[in-house]
Regions:
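Membrane-interface amphipathic segments in extracytoplasmic regions
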Residues: 1-234
Length: 234
């Protein structure tokens, strides 16, 4: 599994902790605007390879240790998502929509069209080291030794207001703002009504609550578990 979760800019004191299934493609499209030279052809901005190899050295992908070492000199940000909703999104996108399940998920034992309950049970019994990054706890991506690395964390559920707050923080840090957030790879949109249908079984709710306990405590401790498992954050 790729351990380099942060995009670091060479000429700007800026880091982005990328979390798959959390507007990652849209945010990368905004970061693309900060590049000063035309990138190499053949790589999509959505891929980590673009940021590690395709920008003529303007950006690199760094691990959590390197990202934390930059806390005193760089502004870092990221966005998180309700773990229940993130799992439903990953299941729909990677297990139901794709005929060929991605290799790392196949290695976990995940298969096209498998039942949602079996999908969750497989995740619950797979170690963090063997999880596909789309299923990795967000706290693993954004923390080191239990300490949060980014200085700004927004939520997908309040993306519009949090994105504006991020722009204000960037201006305060004397960094270029990122402009409007484009809609990229949004399949379910803002409709999270299907979350409750997937989590009608309280056993599945508790399975996810146990597996993603750190995410819930760190990013969503102010919201009741029942509301989260129904996709309700208000």
């Amino acid at each position: 599994m790729n351990q380099r979760h942060f995009i670091q800019f060479r000429d700007l004191p800026l880091l982005y902790g990328r979390v798959p299934k959390v507007a990652n493609s849209s945010i990368k499209a905004c970061l693309y605007r900060l590049l000063t030279t035309s990138p190499e052809k053949g790589l999509r901005t959505t891929s980590d390879a673009f940021w590690s190899k395709g920008t003529h050295g303007e950006t690199s992908m760094v691990d959590n240790h390197s990202a934390r070492m930059c806390r005193g000199t760089h502004f870092s940000f990221s966005f998180v998502r309700n773990p229940f909703d993130r799992l439903v999104s990953a299941y729909n996108n990677k297990i139901l929509e794709l005929d060929d399940v991605p290799g790392p998920m196949q290695a976990m034992g995940l298969k096209h069209g498998m039942a949602f309950s079996a999908f969750l049970e497989c995740i619950a019994t797979t170690s963090d080291a063997d999880l596909d990054v789309h299923l990795l706890p967000q706290s693993n991506i954004l923390c080191l030794d239990g300490q949060l690395i980014p200085s700004f964390i927004g939520r997908l559920e309040t993306m519009e207001s949090d994105w504006q707050q991020l722009q204000r923080r960037l201006r305060q840090e004397r960094l270029p703002t990122l402009g409007n957030l484009p809609e990229k790879n949004r399949r379910r949109g803002d409709d999270h009504s299907d979350v409750v249908q997937y989590f009608e079984d309280s056993g599945l709710v508790h399975l996810v609550a146990d597996r993603y306990d750190n995410d819930l405590k760190l990013f969503y401790s102010d919201i009741d578990l029942d509301h989260l498992s129904r996709g309700l954050l208000n």
